Amino acid sequence: MKKRISRIICTLLCCAPIAISAQTSEKITSPVNLYKEGKELFQEKNYAAAIPALKAFVKQKPTASLLQDAEYMLVSSAYELKDKNRIELLRKYLDRYPDTPYANRIYSLLASCYFYEGKYDEALALFNSTRLDLLGNEERDDRTYQLATCYMKTDNLKEAAIWFETLRASSPKYAKDCSYYLAYIRYTQKRYDEALKDFLPLQDDPKYKELVPYYIAEIYAIKKNYDKAQIVAQNYLSAYPNNEHAAEMYRILGDAYYHFGQYHQAVEAFTGYLDRDHSAPRRDALYMLGLSYYQTKVYSKAAEMLGQVTTANDALTQNAY
């Protein structure tokens, strides 16, 4: 009898860990815990880790409201992780849940996807279906920046400027980017004083210091402020001799030397421009180079350069003759 009781006790003791393990495993993989785990990881922006738990939860056939939430987190995670099928997943979610409370954010994510693909018209159409003011602050600013850029890329500079101004006033993160694009827009509109006002503070900014000096020097030259144009161009060429804007800086430098009457230096600078610019050179630069050669008595070169200017029936051609 004692032996029988001992065997029963041993059997129970051996089975107990298995039963406890099964209960623990069931507790961990229960729908409630899977949902809780996936949601916590999603809120922590640990999207890759959130996906397995959320997918496992969806397989448990939960209630409609929780299923909608879980699938929202899944498609949002696909967006954040740049899943190649993210556009399709986001659109399918909207088709499945047309009345979802997450529709506004889903539209904003779709717009962002098209923005990154360079499909600016498609992005704009979706942004127009979105209330950006209902997004979280960080995401609102990101989408506003994308919206403004879309307008600029589609040549709607008026709307682009409005949105860049709006964002600059509210977002320290994007303030300098907005200032640059606003300055660029003003530059293209020939509103040079306004452009210069926004370009100047960006001269020492790490992101823009190799870019804005060209516009600053060009504006100075356009406004016939040749001494400042010369200084900016010389400093730039000393710092960034191989930059893509170096050719234009040599042209601006040649422009300044020409108007100072320093024709030898003008020839040298304009030659630097032609050596680096492999596109069609500007006719006004060829004209000034031709006259600089003439002033330095290199008449054959003067004739060659001025001959290249007479390709259109305009004042520059008349002056070249």
Task: Annotate each language-model stretch with its function.
Residues K2-I8, I20-Y321:
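Acidic, polar-rich low-complexity tracts and alpha-helical solenoid repeat scaffolds
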